[in-house]
């Protein structure tokens, strides 16, 4: 068996920048930043670029691929070093990383926020099922709730839990993934990825007419995680794959980036048929996996993103930023539009809203990471594989 690339390197220094960019696309989608810019820029190619990077779905899909890559890489390295996978320790590490902040946000959304709404003379009930969120099944709750919204025409899903569905899918992935590699013989590992990618594509094809299912359902997006995992597997087990990414030239990398971005920007023209949903996601997520692998292992990268220190530092707070930014956005909206009574349609007000929401989210994310998440992360380290 070939040796893994940079076997002792568990922290990938160039990925924190990408984490923040993925978060920012989600943030941009929730603040309508893309619409704000597109309405003021009348250059088609620029607007297409803005559209791609202001769609929350782009960032969420990238997060899935990144999680699949990192978790699979760590599991396979553990198997290489120790000859087994300690499933219990894996679960404990994931619980200590995900649950504390996740359940704090749930507490705020379902217990504290309703009282705030009453103070603001807004007594609309929260339509979501708290038990689905507590049990990490909120992606199915979102499907049901949005179906009701489509029938009634009333949109009242609290923005604070607008991202919980993706965390639920990640947790479902964490539950299943280590068991597969602990129980299935090593010689069959590559088939795990192939089978899951195939099943996910077939599921999307069968449900191609239902955009809610193809966007929120676990089976529809599991291929994202599997593709990230497959690239991690090949990074460790394929000498040919390793050498390709080590030796790929700058101009070749540039070509892939241009092609990948073009597909993302002009996908609606390239894939006009509704049947294309079955495989078009595989193409975009393979591009995301290429970016991750190229940044980690290429010796001729056009630029290593970890050199951009400020954004890289912000990337360390990404989990908190991702979960908390809806609260920051809502807080700023309440202050600007409910309390100060500013005009939502004015350009200056919209700029203040977007910039303030980002700053507030970063501040809350920093506080959360430093004073709330870090103690759990230190405890998590006790369950790392030695």
Model-derived regions, located:
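Short, Lys/Arg-rich, polar N-terminal cytosolic tail immediately upstream
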Residues: 1-11
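Interfacial loop-to-helix transition and helix-capping segments at the boundaries
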Residues: 10-13, 49-60, 124, 128, ...
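Alpha-helical transmembrane segments of multi-pass integral membrane proteins
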Residues: 111, 225, 230, 253-374
